[in-house]
Amino acid sequence: MAAADLAHIPDVDIDSDGVFKYVLIRVHSASRSGAPVAESKEIVRGYKWAEYHADIYDKVSGDMQKQGCDCECLGGGRISHQSQDKKIHVYGYTMAYGPAQHAISTEKIKAKYPDYEVTWANDGY
């Protein structure tokens, strides 16, 4: 996948309501025989169906590999999404991957949901 194609991968894909697990993932073009990775981007993925953070990462990384990209999980936590109140709160951590940099996650979420109040905290699980 060419670096320009990374722009076609949505920065944020989260469920519309509820409290659920999320992961922050760095996606980059698959390197060829040790060649340096030209460009990467971080994406936020959070879904109610996931029992574990690894379930999200495994699905997303599999999808990205099919598109010619490599991934690394940068951490995770939970998202509380209240669409009626237009509020999203990002918090906590994942036992498997550690805490994500919630500040990065919330900036990406704010870009997708500009009319929402988006907050974050490191506490909670």
Swiss-Prot record:
GO molecular function, one term: protein histidine phosphatase activity
PTM sites of type N-acetylalanine: A2
Catalytic activity reported: N(pros)-phospho-L-histidyl-[protein] + H2O = L-histidyl-[protein] + phosphate; N(tele)-phospho-L-histidyl-[protein] + H2O = L-histidyl-[protein] + phosphate
Main location: cytoplasm
Subunit text: Monomer.
Pfam assignment, any one: Ocnus
Keywords: Acetylation, Cytoplasm, Hydrolase, Protein phosphatase
Ligand binding (substrate): K21, T94, M95, A96
Species per Swiss-Prot/TrEMBL record: Pongo abelii
Biological classification of the source: Eukaryota, Metazoa, Chordata, Craniata, Vertebrata
Entry function: Exhibits phosphohistidine phosphatase activity.
SUPFAM superfamilies associated with the record: PHP14-like (SSF143724)
Localization per record: Cytoplasm
InterPro entries: Janus (IPR007702), Janus_sf (IPR038596)
Catalytic residues in the record: H53 (proton acceptor)
Name listed for the protein in its UniProt record: 14 kDa phosphohistidine phosphatase
Cellular component annotations (GO), alphabetically ordered: cytosol
Family to which this protein belongs: Belongs to the janus family.
Enzyme class, broadest EC rank: hydrolase
EC numbers on record: 3.9.1.3
